[in-house]
Amino acid sequence: LKGIKVIDDFVTPFIDRTLSLSRDELEKLGKSDTEFTFLHSLANYTRDPKVIRDQLIAVLLAGRDTTAATLSWLMYELAHYPQTWQKLRAEVLEHVGPDRDPTYEDLKKLKYLNNALNETLRLYPAVPFNVRYALTDTTLPSCVSGHPDISVVKGDAVFYSTMAMQRRADLYPPTSADFAPVDVFSPERWEHWQPKPWQYVPFNGGPRICVGQNFALTEMAYVMVRIAQKYSRVEYRGDWHAQIHKVEIVGCPGNGVTVALFEDEK
């Protein structure tokens, strides 16, 4: 209860301030690229402060640790593969430049950066385990020769690991000069490979797919662009191979990711 009060004390003033705006004021803000916020959008749909609070908390909590963990894993890999960092940075400087604030359109055009994010989410999905409950009786076919099919009764909990699914070598093309082993970080694989349905599900899928998927990808791409604009080199501090995968709700680097960033010499 004490923690809930801290959260409420933080978000309530923002909600009250927004609800004090008239419909005309909200409509005027909606035409601005710089002043219109998610909170203003919510106020256009409901004037119920509890509903707005719940939506804000969902975004603040679900969009914090997941994004932070993914960016940490990306920096962990980039520090180990300097040539990948240089390639990513070159793309950013070519399409955005060293100083300009990237637009949403810029972020979508940065193919190598988006490939790097996809590759990070493939190896380290933010939520590596999940559960679904069967709505009807069904049977799952066995994938192992000689083993019986699996009966699933309505109401049964089905646990699955997105991390294990996305690292199954039998679901990928054979290793080659153009396709790195499945457990190796390689944004290049996305240049000539597209996963089959349900093979790549870092945001899950179906009616319960993560509603913040595009927001998260945009946020992470923006952060990486700003870092790449300023820093020419990334070095890992510590034993890269000693890293562990810590899993609670979110899967994150158990030892943290300590890196040194070197500014571009102008």
Language model: regions and residue ranges:
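Conserved cytochrome P450 catalytic core segment spanning the I/J/K helices
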Residues: 2-70, 187
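C-terminal helix/juxtamembrane-tail motif
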Residues: 252-266
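Cytochrome P450 I-helix active-site segment
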Residues: 27-35, 77-127, 134-136, 153-156, ...
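Short, small-residue alpha-helix embedded
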Residues: 66-79, 223
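Conserved cytochrome P450 K-helix/beta-meander segment immediately N-terminal to the heme-binding cysteine loop
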Residues: 160-193
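Cytochrome P450
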Residues: 1-10, 46, 61, 105-115, ...
